[in-house]
């Protein structure tokens, strides 16, 4: 008797990028697997818009580029293509070799947390992001309550490995809390980020 195993198809990065051009939805790519991204709630999208507006206006005239959730990021150590909810790059923007639509040198990354993705954003995705040498600061924005988590890279690694760096963790929960974004020398107020958000 022959048993047929239905193993998931393994895609090359080139196959993924080709499929992504013609896809109606955005997909992540992780080490051969294509992962459809779920649509966001209105609150999720409002928070992405508010955060990126605060970043864009705060950094006008400075040598940074601000990107929203449609900008693809390449993480070579994990063979990972993803679309962060927010991203700041110190100019010049570096593109993946042979691509005009995929960046590789973020300074600050942000994700808006949902019940289905918060563990992934805090753990696996953060671990992948930490392998990028330019990455300095990570923001996790809660969409169910007034709450933001900040991770800031500290000093030089002890062993020379990018994975051996220490990260400073801070939480913000009050409207008047000032979030100091040290990687880009910008301060934003938590209440401004959540100004038009209704949690009901």
Predicted segments, located by residue:
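Gly/Pro/Ser/Thr-rich low-complexity, intrinsically disordered segments predominantly at protein N-termini
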Residues: 1-200
